[in-house]
Amino acid sequence: MADAEVITFPKKHKKKKDRKPLQEDDVAEIQHAEEFLIKPESKVAQLDTSQWPLLLKNFDKLNVRTAHYTPLPCGSNPLKREIGDYIRTGFINLDKPSNPSSHEVVAWIRRILRVEKTGHSGTLDPKVTGCLIVCIERATRLVKSQQSAGKEYVGIVRLHNAIEGGTQLSRALETLTGALFQRPPLIAAVKRQLRVRTIYESKMIEYDPERRLGIFWVSCEAGTYIRTLCVHLGLLLGVGGQMQELRRVRSGVMSEKDHMVTMHDVLDAQWLYDNHKDESYLRRVVYPLEKLLTSHKRLVMKDSAVNAICYGAKIMLPGLLRYEDGIEVNQEIVVITTKGEAICMAIALMTTAVISTCDHGIVAKIKRVIMERDTYPRKWGLGPKASQKKMMIKQGLLDKHGKPTDNTPATWKQDYIDYSDSGKNTLVTEAVQAPQLAAEAVNVIKRKRDSESESDETPTVPQLKEKKKKKDKKPKTVLESGGETGDGDNDTTKKKKKKKVKVVEEMSE
């Protein structure tokens, strides 16, 4: 037999496709096309949520209290809401034009979008341009927090006389940092009182010595008057100065680089939707309100607890799924659903360490509810007692308010505690006071025994002391009562007679 020849063919190596980095537009399309949802699991799965949108970004880095909950087919991802709800729960990062006032601009947008309510993140003077956050309908609940957020400006100051180079101007800007006294300008909508405003950082960008113009950048507290700052700059330099031009670069979380749009963009987007039913441009112009809350610490609640919070219930620990690191007491946080919707703004009552070690208690108190009521179904009042109460109301054993009637069984009256009643907690208080009364009775018995033992040893001493005390108390009571007995009356009459005698003697003299 001839030796068999083995022929080997070279293996074809599959070429790995080079993954191109996603552009911003592609990411937006993916976020809109795909489904983003936290699924209930018994084990914690490893997720890559760095590309998840808005409040669900880096969701896997949150601390897990429990991963088990019952998902409800209610609510939706903020980016996938219906266009009507999307606009009513959104905001616009508007590039305010020069000349119209902030209120005029907001009124125009309300008319263009045909909504009932709009608000803005802080008034800009008519000549000032730049970032103006316009909140629509439900998003107006975040207006106050946006108005108090920090702001950044780029301005031009005109000096009345020339100075030697721009170093003096930059030094003067550095001195005008920190807490400063400011009085509003002559033409202002508020009372011209002295107020303290903080300037966090400022730097000079450019100075033109020929035209005596300086461009500067300022990061400051809300309510700072840049016009007043320019006047102070001129006073520091000794030449005088005034503000020539101003633009707001950042308001809160949003800056001029974060999808800023003009009034024409809003008008065109609404026209396209009205005439061609193309909502893609409206979704580019309007952004969900959750984008304003991305800098806050997050608490994730179960779906069954969402509607209770919308009705004002306390944020309790059993309804918590996940929580973020670094939560401090009295810090402003945002409470979200598993789909990334903002439920409310809250004030934390527990730190992250306390949340991780406790199994009950109030985590936070509500500051402002954002979500509409009954977006999720009611899940309270489904316990055994509540269900029994509903059945008894249907059967006529209780009235329509759940109060006992003549037909109510005696066992129900004895066992059931009505916490909503005005005379509530009677049984509870008795149950709480019972051990206290028992303890007091034991203490009284012990005291009696101690006193009896003391009386057996020295019976005469305590009796003498008691008698002395009684004797001492009698004259005190008489004096305090203001002369109830006859002796007191005699003393007063004697004093009156003496006074009369003295008066008669003086008259005779």
Swiss-Prot record:
Modified residues annotated as Phosphoserine in this record: S387, S451, S453, S455, S481, S508
Sites of N-acetylalanine modification: A2
Cystine bridges: none
Primary localisation category: nucleus
Active-site residues from the entry: D125 (nucleophile)
A biological process from GO: scaRNA localization to Cajal body
GO CC annotation terms, alphabetical: box H/ACA snoRNP complex; box H/ACA telomerase RNP complex; Cajal body; fibrillar center; nucleolus; telomerase holoenzyme complex
UniProt tissue specificity: Ubiquitously expressed, with elevated levels in Purkinje cells, the olfactory bulb, and Leydig cells of the testis.
Location of the region described as Nuclear and nucleolar localization in the Swiss-Prot/TrEMBL record: 446-509
Record flagged with keyword Ubl conjugation: yes
Any single Pfam family the record assigns to this protein: DKCLD
CDD domains reported for this sequence: PseudoU_synth_hDyskerin, PUA_Cbf5
Amino acid composition bias (Basic residues), ranges on this chain: 10-19, 466-476
Positions of modified residues (Phosphothreonine): T458, T485
Protein name: H/ACA ribonucleoprotein complex subunit DKC1
Native organism: Mus musculus
Gene name as annotated: Dkc1
